[in-house]
């Protein structure tokens, strides 16, 4: 993750692209305590991929920007050059 910048945030067990930026207070959660089945799944288009693990954050693409106090759910995919507005929730619900 060359030159990625993350300011006072929680980033749990995630894959972060180059030059990604995360403003203060943003959270990338890595555990789904609200579900019976804790395994993390990732939705890519119409395909759901089971990671086989209970702790996995998000896939954050190159040059993505995550605004202050945004909440990113486990298994979320933030594509390259995506801008997540401040106070947003990103949850693909896979």
Regions found by a protein language model. Name each.
Residues 1-94:
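Glycine-rich hexapeptide-repeat left-handed beta-helix
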